[in-house]
């Protein structure tokens, strides 16, 4: 059997599969279905300085080959995440976990990251500058190289753990933003978050989502996400975590050939809670089929 392990910023993962933030809760919920220690790691629910109740309902709309969501970063706030959620997580997950942090000001990001950084179970901090669902924050940082850089510099001053910046695809030039984050000190880049989309209820003649618009994800976005991962990984020297419409072991191999060191799986978890388990179990078959002896060796292998 081929070697599935990869090294992400100094930490060895048994495999490159990472459930994406917002699709896997705080992990322990999924441990009732299967042993989540088979995962490379996972990115837990997006955490903010203060508790957030999220957007009004309805928050989810189905689409052909995908879905739109506008949950709005619902979470109990960083203090409760540390005091209540992480203890439940560490009882069942015995590897380093990826924290996911959002904010509505540079100070918010720094405050939350500084607190999360002190937790032993956290191996990486994924700084989400790309959430498209919250008015006045999140997305505005990720659509400007200057604003994204400012967040990265502030977070790097107060943390010791690797910082991975999660980018929005809803920009004119994602490569410019990735390079700006690298220059500001980011240790890695993850991309892409969801694409901004909407659906209209023909009977009511109103948007299906109460927030009007939300993040479109699912298999339909995979080719666009793959292209962006390829472009960014060829433009920066830091590791890239690829995501966007990944739903099979073949998709994972494509992402890695495009330049991803590890691969996040998002919407597929909402369709099938066993999605990541199935992908991990199928990887050896796909590796054998395409004569891949080591996943680490194929990173960026597409010319």
Question: Residue ranges of each PLM-predicted region?
Answer:
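Short gly/pro/ser/thr-enriched loop/turn and capping motifs at secondary-structure boundaries
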Residues: 48-53, 132-134, 196-199, 270-272
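A short, charged, Gly/Pro-tolerant segment at domain boundaries
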Residues: 296-303
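Short donor-sugar binding/catalytic loops of nucleotide-sugar-dependent glycosyltransferases
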Residues: 246
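Short acidic/polar active-site loop segments enriched in Thr and Asp
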Residues: 39-40, 45, 95, 122-125, ...
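Alpha/beta enzyme core
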Residues: 104-241, 250-260, 265
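C-terminal helical cap(s) of enzyme catalytic domains, especially alpha/beta-barrels
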Residues: 55-64, 200-214, 256, 268-293
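N-terminal capping/small domains of soluble enzymes
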Residues: 1-97, 102-104
């Amino acid at each position: 059997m081929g070697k599935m392990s990869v090294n992400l910023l100094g930490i060895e993962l048994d495999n490159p599969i990472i459930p994406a933030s917002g699709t896997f809760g705080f992990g322990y919920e999924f441990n009732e279905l299967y042993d989540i220690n088979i995962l490379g790691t996972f990115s837990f629910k997006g955490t903010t300085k203060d508790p957030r109740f999220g957007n009004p309902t309805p928050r989810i709309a189905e689409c052909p080959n995908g879905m739109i969501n506008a949950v709005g970063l619902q979470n109990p706030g960083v203090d409760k995440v540390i005091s209540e959620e992480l203890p439940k997580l560490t009882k069942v997950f015995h590897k380093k976990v990826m924290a996911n942090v959002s904010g509505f000001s540079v100070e918010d990001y720094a405050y939350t990251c500084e607190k999360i950084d002190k937790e032993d179970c956290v191996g990486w901090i994924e700084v989400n500058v790309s959430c498209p669902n919250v008015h006045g924050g999140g997305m505005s940082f990720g659509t400007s190289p200057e604003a994204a850089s400012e967040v990265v510099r502030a977070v790097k001053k107060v943390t010791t753990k690797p910082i991975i910046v999660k980018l929005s695809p809803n920009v004119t030039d994602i490569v410019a933003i990735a390079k700006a984050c690298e220059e500001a000190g980011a240790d890695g880049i993850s991309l892409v978050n969801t694409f901004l989309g909407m659906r209209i209820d023909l009977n009511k003649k109103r948007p299906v989502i109460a927030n009007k618009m939300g993040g479109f994800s699912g298999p339909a976005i995979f080719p666009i996400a793959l292209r962006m991962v390829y472009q960014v990984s060829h433009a920066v020297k830091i590791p890239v975590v690829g995501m966007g419409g990944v739903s099979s072991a073949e998709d994972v191999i494509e992402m890695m050939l495009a330049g991803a060191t590890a691969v996040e799986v998002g919407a597929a978890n909402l369709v099938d809670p066993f999605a990541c388990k199935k992908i991990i179990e199928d990887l050896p078959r796909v590796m054998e089929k395409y004569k891949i002896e080591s996943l680490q060796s194929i990173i960026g292998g597409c010319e």
